[in-house]
Design a protein with these regions (language model features):
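Secreted/periplasmic carbohydrate-active enzymes, especially glycoside hydrolases
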Residues: 2-218, 222-226, 266-267, 281-282, ...
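Substrate-binding/catalytic cleft of secreted carbohydrate-active enzymes
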Residues: 193-196, 203-387
Length: 387
């Protein structure tokens, strides 16, 4: 827990979407920013709430793949662009919109040629900085945000990153320390990341809630793909219903629309905090909560706010009424033979094991059968070891 103060005029929200063209040759940086607050002026007027004489400088620095232009060098460091935006009430630019409260929204797009693409093998990052200046020209706020250019999509039923089929060699990770319980130090998190990379692990599923922000930043920097999971698990209610102990209409959230506002709020919180991390390829609605209309609507909320990522949910395996909840087939502890059988009968989606091999104690045997399957079955795209 920490407290901090903000200047009277400050950046309330920053959304950055690096959109890479299908050719992978060029990209577009789409930035949406909300500035709020009031500026003190000597002469009070009707425009006091507006941000008179406030400006923002936006700068992108990082790597550029010169090899695409035939240059001798491969990657070069440089300033990609910088832009100064003035928040004048009479500004007629399409970039800026003022609200009734005096806040300003900024929509800004910039072409980037030959970007160095982010991946687990080459986690090339750019640095976006936003400097906010008050009416006296003083820098009152400085924001630095790492961003990565990458193209993740479903193509012909296969998940691809930067035009190539991706295979997840992943683990599930609870936020827990063997020494301090739920209070995990930054040093332990860093050691986790380094250990994963040393063992050829390339992906994390944040089971079953958003983790502390630091691990997302480390995954950006070191190169680990993420399934970022929303805070939802109601294992007990559907487990009891599946054994006939309680009626199915008692499953939470199920089709009970009383739960929907709370669940959509959780999805929004999950998205808003972590939306700018290139490591996040997939949003996960939650874990082991059966199915139903509410969970389907949660998946649609993710898609509405973020069309550049996919959405995951394993629970459709137990409730097939809303197949569209998950963009991929996701199962737990399914044998290799049953994966083959399923894919032979269902060709609509790729398949991942969001939990498999149950690696506690002296276990994890025969894992090679799963890794071998990624070489022979294109639509089997890996899994995440439990625990």
């Amino acid at each position: 827990v920490y407290l901090y103060t903000m200047p009277k005029v400050h950046v309330y929200d920053l959304k950055v979407q690096p959109v890479v063209e299908e050719s992978l040759e060029n990209a577009k940086l789409v930035l949406d920013m909300e500035i709020c607050g009031k500026v003190e002026t000597v002469e009070k007027s009707a425009d006091d709430a507006k941000m008179q004489n406030v400006s923002a400088k936006i700068t992108l620095t990082g790597s550029r793949d010169d090899s695409k232009e035939g240059a001798a060098g491969s990657v070069s460091e440089n300033t990609i662009f910088f832009e100064t935006i003035s928040f004048q009430p009479n500004n007629t630019s399409d970039t800026i919109r003022f609200t009734d409260t005096g806040a300003a929204t900024v929509h800004f797009e910039q072409q980037v040629s030959h970007p160095a693409l982010w991946s687990a093998e080459h986690p090339d990052l750019y640095t976006l900085t936003v400097e906010l200046f008050d009416e006296s020209g003083n820098c009152v706020e400085y924001i630095s945000q790492n961003i990565g250019f990458r193209r993740f999509e479903m193509k012909d039923g296969i998940m691809t990153l930067n035009g190539k089929r991706i295979v997840f060699k992943g683990v599930n990770r609870h936020e827990f320390s063997s020494k301090t319980g739920r209070a995990v130090s930054k040093e332990e998190v860093l050691q986790d990341i380094i250990t994963m990379k040393q063992n050829n692990i390339n992906a994390i599923r944040t089971c079953h809630y958003p983790d502390a922000s630091g691990i997302y930043e480390l995954c950006d920097r070191y190169g680990l793909y993420m399934i970022a999971e929303n805070n939802l698990e109601s294992h007990g209610s559907w487990d009891a219903a599946s054994h006939g102990l309680v009626p199915k209409d008692t499953i939470v959230p199920g089709d009970n629309m009383d739960w929907e506002p709370m669940m959509l709020d959780r999805v929004n919180s999950c998205y808003q905090r972590d939306k700018n991390h290139p490591a996040i390829l997939i949003w996960s609605v939650g874990n082991e909560s059966y199915g139903g209309k509410v969970i389907f609507d949660m998946s649609e909320k993710f898609r509405a706010v973020d069309p550049h990522r996919l959405v995951h949910y394993e629970g459709i395996f137990n409730d097939r009424r809303y197949e569209g909840t998950s963009d991929m087939e996701s199962q737990m502890y399914t044998s290799v033979e049953n994966i083959k059988k399923f894919l032979a009968e269902h060709k609509e989606k790729p398949f991942i094991c969001c939990e498999y091999t149950h690696a506690m104690g002296n276990s994890c045997g025969a894992m090679h059968k799963y890794t071998d399957l990624t070489d022979t079955e294109p639509r089997y795209q890996g899994g995440f070891i439990w625990d």
